[in-house]
């Protein structure tokens, strides 16, 4: 998986009529407990278990899922890998409805510099207690409506480094974040 050109993640917006699958797979969003963005694939992952999630369908971004059983329930850890930073074109509803998601690592592998819409990006991530969004570039974002809507287990959230100079819509951005005790906007 050696690519020198830009690696753009496919659009993955949830359906409005019901539960959606993850990035073109048959796995439901509600079955994901962890998302890890990374640069390399472990050796134990074979080609048959990976699928292409790049917008160009050029295998510049690959994903695979590892089965985990929690309380006898089949769930998955999702891994997304690329040799370069993964560029987002649009983040609207990107993680919407991942209701069992407990951990997501956005870290250094995401390039959101050209994203203008982050509305409902983490909407309905009920199980997520903490989230590090310090790596998100929000300098071109105009819409943050409902970005953290219904993230009911967040206790603290630091968005102090968000560049909101172009944002025109923040409606319901933190609605139903019922456990939120500390919100850093400074």
Positions of the model-derived regions?
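Negatively charged
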Residues: 1-186
């Amino acid at each position: 998986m050696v690519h020198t050109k830009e690696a753009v993640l496919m659009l993955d917006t949830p359906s409005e009529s019901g539960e959606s699958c993850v990035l073109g797979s048959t796995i439901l969003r509600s079955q994901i407990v962890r998302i890890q963005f990374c640069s390399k694939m472990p050796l134990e992952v074979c080609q048959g278990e990976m699928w292409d999630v790049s917008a160009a369908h050029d295998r510049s971004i690959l994903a695979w899922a590892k089965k985990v059983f929690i309380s006898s329930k089949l769930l998955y850890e999702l891994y997304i890998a690329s040799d370069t930073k993964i560029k987002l074109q649009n983040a609207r509803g990107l993680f919407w409805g991942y209701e069992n998601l407990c951990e997501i690592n956005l870290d250094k592998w995401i390039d959101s510099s050209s994203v203008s819409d982050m509305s409902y990006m983490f909407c309905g991530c009920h199980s997520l207690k903490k989230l590090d969004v310090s790596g998100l570039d929000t300098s071109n974002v105009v819409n943050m409506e409902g970005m953290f809507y219904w993230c009911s287990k967040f206790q603290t959230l630091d968005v102090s480094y968000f560049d909101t100079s172009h944002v025109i819509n923040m409606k319901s951005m933190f609605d139903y974040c019922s456990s939120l005790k500390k919100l850093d906007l400074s």
